[in-house]
């Protein structure tokens, strides 16, 4: 249904309709309220939802007010209220910005834990990239050399996981066979226990290290230690990992090389 014109009240058809100031107008009825000049969408100015030309557009006029004591008091009171509101907003938003955090022992522990997690993730990514399909053939000889030197195999390099103290369990199992061999020859009754003990000890040359950071084991083949612990029977596996025994707890396993220093 066609709307009515806001000026003359007659029906406005689409061919002559002007939609402006939230009303509908005929093109001929859309003129200035004062001089009746026909306006368009480019040169009109609206005031109280009525069209005006640029010359007759109502202008705001300001009245001069004398600086009486009452007016000065009101002005000063308004400024004080504005200043009070500004301080209130400032105090409300004060805690939402940057604030200095005290370096407490709890925050230091959290920071150290995050550094350890980042270091572990770095080593995991390094191991994954080193054991990828493209570089698997070149890494295999290095892996075998590490197994022969340390008598230890990481779970990621074998199909079935083995117990934590692998070097001590294997020679004990071979001891009865050695005794049977010596008894079959006859006359030689010296026990083969020293041989098994000699193999069970890690071949690290008696190196001793001291822990400079706390470390929590991230895998079953690793050991946990605290700052200041002594690591004995240490042997180097690669640039990033070592194998040794924590003297305080007696646990044996892998540990990161950058968490300890030589004594």
UniProtKB/Swiss-Prot annotation:
SUPFAM superfamilies: Glucocorticoid receptor-like (DNA-binding domain) (SSF57716), SH3-domain (SSF50044). The gene is Lasp1. This is LIM and SH3 domain protein 1. The modification N-acetylmethionine is found at residue 1. Nebulin repeats lie at residues 61-95, 97-131. It holds the Pfam family SH3_9. The modification Phosphoserine is found at residues 99, 118, 134. GO terms for biological process: monoatomic ion transport. The modification Phosphothreonine is found at residues 68, 104, 156. One of its GO terms (molecular function) is metal ion binding. Residues 148-162 have a biased composition (Polar residues). The modification N6-methyllysine is found at residue 75.
